[in-house]
Amino acid sequence: MRDETPEQPAPLRFGYTTGSCATATSLAAARLLLAGQADDAVEIVLPKGQRVMMRLEFCRATADGAEAGTIKDAGDDPDVTHGALIFARVALAAAPGVRFHAGPGVGTVTRAGLMLPVGEPAINPVPRQMMTTHLEALAAEHGYAGGFDVTIGVEGGEMLALKTMNPRLGIVGGLSILGTTGIVRPFSCSAYIASIHQGIDVARANGIAHIAACTGNASEDAMRAHYQLPDMALIEMGDFAGAVLKHLRRAPVARLSMCGGFGKLSKLAAGHLDLHSRHSSIDLPLLAQWAAEAGANDALQAAMRAANTSQEALKLAQADGVPLGDLVCAHALRVARDIVPPSVVIEMFAIDRQGRFVGVAR
């Protein structure tokens, strides 16, 4: 008899951050310089104490030091750097300590508000600490009293960076070297949420008092046209409305405009802070209830509950003169108001699929 037990999906694979890759390659290059040992794999210790072995593509001497490279494996996370070659070039220096430099494909910070000063290579604090810890331990092991100049690069990083928020954050010339745990967790979205927080921080540090958080390109275009806001004021929040609102609780601005498609805004209005379809759905009966409170008759309510999409429910309400878009924005505003400090002026905008405003609340 045929076994009809459904096949269990394989668990999603974890991967390693660019910070882990930079640590492994810088350690391998430095070991070649101090011990004459060219490895094809190297063990590193992650910030939480796990030991992992990372395979190297090369480890070789150069005219002024040594270099090593590894292929970034992000596991099953849809990471823009997955499969990229990340490399470190290390040179010994008389002065003690570790100094970091941006190689090809790694960006440089040009705006205030990030975790690094303007002019520094975009190598975040945790990866810097990881590399420093490993290199200092290696130096102690070999009785080396000097320092290290470490240059980190990403092959093709200049082009890959265009797919990230780095250009808007003022990180020019390439990618950032990231990571807080050393591990990439599949679909954790932590990097995206971090970029939202960074976008807000950069705006604040550069004197932007009014930011617009947008779910996508159409809503961003609508906000740009409506307010003539600079790119620095436009925050690509995607589905992560909660990431914006909760960060503003800690780092407020004077004014927040949130703009999204009507369906996305209806999820926020219902109290959902993650607007992705995996985590929230559109509540048509709730939309019908709100329409009823604005005077919708029984027939319209029934039609809205039976609608196939939120857009269909919106059109039905509009045809009957019920301002459903404004109602949804008003409820979304209440949700945001409960999270964001009262000093922040908030307004909500909903757009249709053509990018036209179909609702507003202030």
Swiss-Prot record:
Q: Which domain of life is it from?
A: Bacteria
Catalysed reaction(s) here are:
Co-precorrin-5B + S-adenosyl-L-methionine = Co-precorrin-6A + S-adenosyl-L-homocysteine
Q: Kindly state which keywords UniProt assigns to this record, in alphabetical order.
A: Cobalamin biosynthesis, Methyltransferase, S-adenosyl-L-methionine, Transferase
Catalytic activity, EC: 2.1.1.195
Pathway(s) the chain acts in? Cofactor biosynthesis; adenosylcobalamin biosynthesis; cob(II)yrinate a,c-diamide from sirohydrochlorin (anaerobic route): step 6/10
Gene Ontology molecular-function annotations? cobalt-precorrin-5B C1-methyltransferase activity
Biological process GO terms, please? Answer: anaerobic cobalamin biosynthetic process; methylation
Write down the InterPro entries for this protein, in alphabetical order. CbiD (IPR002748), CbiD_sf (IPR036074)
Q: Which HAMAP family match?
A: CbiD
Family from the record: Belongs to the CbiD family.
Q: How is this protein named in the record?
A: Cobalt-precorrin-5B C(1)-methyltransferase
Species of the source: Burkholderia orbicola (strain MC0-3)
- Phylogenetic classification of the source organism: Bacteria, Pseudomonadati, Pseudomonadota, Betaproteobacteria, Burkholderiales
Which gene holds the coding sequence for this protein? cbiD
